């Protein structure tokens, strides 16, 4: 009885393919980012920015809190001001608009409900990008706090989707990560 199928030995396999791996492009700065945050409760024109940064050095990015989640459908409260962005640019600063999920007291936003909906995530992405383009921001800084475990995977999906749009439009995307705690 023959227990071998034939000649045993190495076989050369040609894996020829016309597949070209896509190049992952990202926005990367060749310098250290020194960012400050500026909390707003109403639209600001930039006059305080000059005064607030007087005497500082090395700062190259300012992230004003200008977008707030306002509902579970992906709408935002927008208190951005073009004069603020222009003032920051005149000072040689990049401006990364901060979007917050906790600072709008009148909003009743459920992270799981918002982030688990493809339609709501898409609406949120579109609203953020439209506002960034309208006011001339250089980037978006996502500062979502107290995202519970049940919304974790949906949050990551939102960041993935927003990152694709930002990358395609040349908009910087940064994410503030907090140390997870029991709450």
Annotate each predicted stretch with a short phrase.
Residues 1-36, 46-55:
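Non-catalytic propeptide/linker segments at domain boundaries
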């Amino acid at each position: 009885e023959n227990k071998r199928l034939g000649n045993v030995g190495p076989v050369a396999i040609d894996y020829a393919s016309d597949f070209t791996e896509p190049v992952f492009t990202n926005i990367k700065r060749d310098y250290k980012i020194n960012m400050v945050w500026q909390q707003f409760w109403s639209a600001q024109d930039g006059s305080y920015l000059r005064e607030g940064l007087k005497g500082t050095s090395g700062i190259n990015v300012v992230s004003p809190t200008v977008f707030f989640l306002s509902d579970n459908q992906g709408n935002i409260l927008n208190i951005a001001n073009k004069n603020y962005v222009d003032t920051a640019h005149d000072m040689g600063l990049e401006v990364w608009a901060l979007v917050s999920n906790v600072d709008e007291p009148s909003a009743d936003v459920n992270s799981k409900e918002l982030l688990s909906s493809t339609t709501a995530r898409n609406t949120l992405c579109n609203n953020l990008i439209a506002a960034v383009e309208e006011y001339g921001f250089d980037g978006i800084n996502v500062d979502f706090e107290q995202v519970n475990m049940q919304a974790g995977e949906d949050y990551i999906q939102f960041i993935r989707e927003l990152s694709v749009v930002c990358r395609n439009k040349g908009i910087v995307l940064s994410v503030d990560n907090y140390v997870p705690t029991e709450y």
